[in-house]
Amino acid sequence: MMLSLGSDATVLPFHAKNLKFTPKLSTLNGDLAFSKGLGVGRLNCGSVRLNHKQHVRAVGKSFGADENGDGSEDDVVNATIEKSKKVLALQRELIQQIAERKKLVSSIDSDSIPGLEGNGVSYESSEKSLSRDSNPQKGSSSSGSAVETKRWHCFQQLCRSKETETWAVSSVGINQGFDEIEKKNDAVKASSKLHFNEQIKNKLYERPDTKDISSSIRTSSLKFENFEGANEPSSKEVANEAENFESGGEKPPPLAGTNVMNIILVSAECAPWSKTGGLGDVAGSLPKALARRGHRVMIVAPHYGNYAEAHDIGVRKRYKVAGQDMEVTYFHTYIDGVDIVFIDSPIFRNLESNIYGGNRLDILRRMVLFCKAAVEVPWHVPCGGICYGDGNLVFIANDWHTALLPVYLKAYYRDHGLMNYTRSVLVIHNIAHQGRGPVEDFNTVDLSGNYLDLFKMYDPVGGEHFNIFAAGLKTADRIVTVSHGYAWELKTSEGGWGLHNIINESDWKFRGIVNGVDTKDWNPQFDAYLTSDGYTNYNLKTLQTGKRQCKAALQRELGLPVREDVPIISFIGRLDHQKGVDLIAEAIPWMMSHDVQLVMLGTGRADLEQMLKEFEAQHCDKIRSWVGFSVKMAHRITAGSDILLMPSRFEPCGLNQLYAMSYGTVPVVHGVGGLRDTVQPFNPFDESGVGWTFDRAEANKLMAALWNCLLTYKDYKKSWEGIQERGMSQDLSWDNAAQQYEEVLVAAKYQW
């Protein structure tokens, strides 16, 4: 058997059966070979394993005896011991050579493969080896790192060999030294992988009896024929090892590339702890998508209740609000790669069910304290033992509740030469809510008088007033809204709600980005709410059977007649004027003249809630109204219904239509804001589109769109199924939106 100690290195032959060394040294420049008495294995570079082809058996006489097997047993043993000692002496000498070559690998990350130091490692230095260059020439000088790259690719080649190969003799415990020097710059490794693959010859080696060598050499082993004391690895183990070595033990580069940043998203609500609408969903999902791209991400939200996941980190700070000192406590948890920090204070507590409760001044004081505490989180909260700091940092503020954050960043810090490398981005989710009040409210925000002009606004109806959203839009480094359509509407006098002039002046830093869907929570294939009560999980392949079963289960649960041929029309949302519930109410008599069922889920205005109850009483076999909100029922209605209505008068983005399409439910929407961006109207001529839209918030327009939808459902099943499948096939995840947010953050980072 031959032991290879490196590239083009000295090879030690020894017997394959008795594992006894011969002092003869020879140079090996071949692939895989067997001769009488010699078993030759292949070097795998990483784990230093040996193998041989199936059906090939290395048998022969002991090297301690002659060809005829003459010689005493004692002489053979003594000769073997002496030869083993010589091998160990050679290995000790080579260990010393390793120390001299450490300078050659100083640029290599020592964390690539643990275990280099402290292990008995030896391999022969070679004056002729592969060059570090990605296109090596024959005879060029070599560095240690290039040799290791070669060995790394040898291992890949070995582990991809046929499963029918039988693994040969045990590996020599020489592997730690081969492993460490493999982590390189991505460009070097990629080019080496390209050019070395065809040029490298596998080197061969064997190991002596584990009883006769030091423990530093006795590491992993493989079974060779009837050799006792070794275990043959399964093909699964070999595949796992190959996968680990192919990755080199190093993480893939972040999707963000060199633009990795510290990102802190600040929001007054964050699902699943606090939520009143889409803002909570965005705050709970966008940070996770940004973290998957390689950024260090934190969410900051008020501590409204006792959250089991978060723990008090022992940091106390005091801030002045309207002349009164208030103490805050920071709670922290880490979930899905995101640091989550809750700011606790008595004025936030016990508001879980009504987070925007209280009068105007109560809400204003809460938001002033929240923004003051949030802007200092990167200094005071050691997440994982290390604070975020103010370098390479971007804040993402959301709606008027946190629009004071970019103002405080400017007034308290950047105007005084602090946090110069920190940027702020303000996201508009709903510009109808602006934090307006009398000018006297400026005294509550604790700023000097020279910042008053940022907050002053004038409109023909209310006159001069105090406006927090206006100040945030003026001071933020970048502005984002939640869809392209809504971005266009905000620049108009009708859609900008008095702030359109500021937005038009800031057009250079303004962008629309469509929200995504949290596919972990909203995925019919894994939805936890569809695993009981007759519901079932389904995917694109099982759409028709799965949705049919969910529809029947929903009808049974709500007490409606179980009829497969009747379409279920649904509405899920807030009961108010914005959502167009009054348009649905106006269209209900027309709907009831057709063979349909209507399911509505939501809460809001008392008069609209009462109206739903009255309609259910009048049409108890066709209408079900669920006054209130239930996450479980929202999922089940989305899965079991055929059509979703969204007649919103304005809709910045909208999430329910995205959820519906993900579940194979067809949306019928008013073409405004994000609804226009996300729902492509069905075209029967080229079989394109994922739903129906109508252009004005009028009941007759809603009925016309719904009529076309019902006609397609009943008479054109093939087209209907195509609409469902196209909706489910879309990539609606947050990953696309996160990439676009990243572009905005990078632009803010380099903005001066």
Swiss-Prot record:
Pfam families assigned to the protein according to its UniProt record, in alphabetical order: Glyco_trans_1_4, Glyco_transf_5
Catalytic activities: [(1->4)-alpha-D-glucosyl](n) + ADP-alpha-D-glucose = [(1->4)-alpha-D-glucosyl](n+1) + ADP + H(+)
Top-rank lineage group of the source organism: Eukaryota
CDD domains named in the record: GT5_Glycogen_synthase_DULL1-like
Keyword Transit peptide found: yes
SUPFAM superfamilies, sorted: UDP-Glycosyltransferase/glycogen phosphorylase
GO biological process: starch biosynthetic process
Listed name of the protein: Granule-bound starch synthase 2, chloroplastic/amyloplastic
Organism, as annotated: Pisum sativum
